[in-house]
Amino acid sequence: MRKLVIPKYYGRPSIGLALFGCTNRPFYHVCVFPDRALGRRYEGNILEQVGTFDPLPNQKNEKLVALNFGRLKYWIGERNAHISVPVLELLGLSGLFPIHPKSFIRAKDNRALIADQQLKVAAEAAEAEKVAQEQASTGAAATSHPQ
């Protein structure tokens, strides 16, 4: 498709995530597209790949990101490329840009989710301990009073 259209008639280039990988195993390439409107799943629409992002945690619970900062600075600075929100989040976490506000919101939600899970586990443990104490007290009462 890129060869059919004259490049000077494209709009502003866009930096975004292109989905690669398999079913239930996403893998993203951080790519430069000639325009925001063109599809992100077609390899023919990619001008340049400037990084990769693996969203699934590995054995050490890390999400791997590889970025070519030199090429990103070129596309952002000299070519005035538009940057998608997910890429802005990655660039904020990598230190090239300030941290995106959406990252703070996501971290707050994750902390609240973990706190809720810990409260549920503590409540279940307290309930189990209470049941065990009741069983122990009824069992002790039954053995101390022979009939």
Swiss-Prot record:
Record's keyword terms, sorted: Mitochondrion, Ribonucleoprotein, Ribosomal protein
Gene Ontology process terms (BP): mitochondrial translation
Predominant place of localization: mitochondrion
Single annotated GO MF: structural constituent of ribosome
Entries under PANTHER family matching the protein: 30S RIBOSOMAL PROTEIN S16 (PTHR12919), SMALL RIBOSOMAL SUBUNIT PROTEIN BS16M (PTHR12919:SF20)
Family label: Belongs to the bacterial ribosomal protein bS16 family.
Subunit organization: Component of the mitochondrial ribosome small subunit (28S) which comprises a 12S rRNA and about 30 distinct proteins.
Name the record gives this protein: Small ribosomal subunit protein bS16m
Organism for this UniProt entry: Caenorhabditis elegans
